[in-house]
């Protein structure tokens, strides 16, 4: 890789690191091409970047970005997973991926400016994602309106039942 290519990689990585809400630094040892391709596809479908990075270039790119505090963890084989919207989804996908693989290890992460360790990433993976939270909030907002509609409708239903029962009673007498 010549100097121009390196500068281009640094510039591209710097731009992505600056926009990332979540960046997870992992160690991908002993993974075959099919497994990595499958992981990349799952992450890409969730709009998450996965890159095997050259440590020196990644460390230079991290300067002046939210990822800078974890730049010292760019040692050995390094994969960088970056998300620009949801901070929980990458943790969930990586935790799911790691269930069957001991070789893939999360070193550290930076989530919205806060450095967390591998255990913190595992804990984050157990939290509901952005879409799930939105669904829960929508359900909580809709619930009082549903209850109110039921309460408003109940007296009318009861009155209709009483009138119907009285009508049947009068019909039987006639």
Swiss-Prot record:
Assembly notes: Part of the ribosomal stalk of the 50S ribosomal subunit. The N-terminus interacts with L11 and the large rRNA to form the base of the stalk. The C-terminus forms an elongated spine to which L12 dimers bind in a sequential fashion forming a multimeric L10(L12)X complex.
Keywords: Ribonucleoprotein, Ribosomal protein, RNA-binding, rRNA-binding
Protein name listed in UniProt: Large ribosomal subunit protein uL10
NCBIfam families: PRK00099.1-1 (NF000955)
Similarity comment: Belongs to the universal ribosomal protein uL10 family.
UniProt entry tagged with the keyword Transferase: no
Family matches, as PANTHER family: 39S RIBOSOMAL PROTEIN L10, MITOCHONDRIAL
Any one GO molecular-function label of the UniProt entry: large ribosomal subunit rRNA binding
GO biological process: translation
GO cellular component, one term: ribonucleoprotein complex
Purpose of the protein: Forms part of the ribosomal stalk, playing a central role in the interaction of the ribosome with GTP-bound translation factors.
InterPro entries: Ribosomal_uL10, Ribosomal_uL10-like_sf, Ribosomal_uL10_bac, Ribosomal_uL10_bac_type
Record organism: Anaeromyxobacter dehalogenans (strain 2CP-1 / ATCC BAA-258)
Membrane-traversing stretches: none
Keyword Ribosomal protein: yes
UniProt superkingdom: Bacteria
SUPFAM superfamilies: Ribosomal protein L10-like
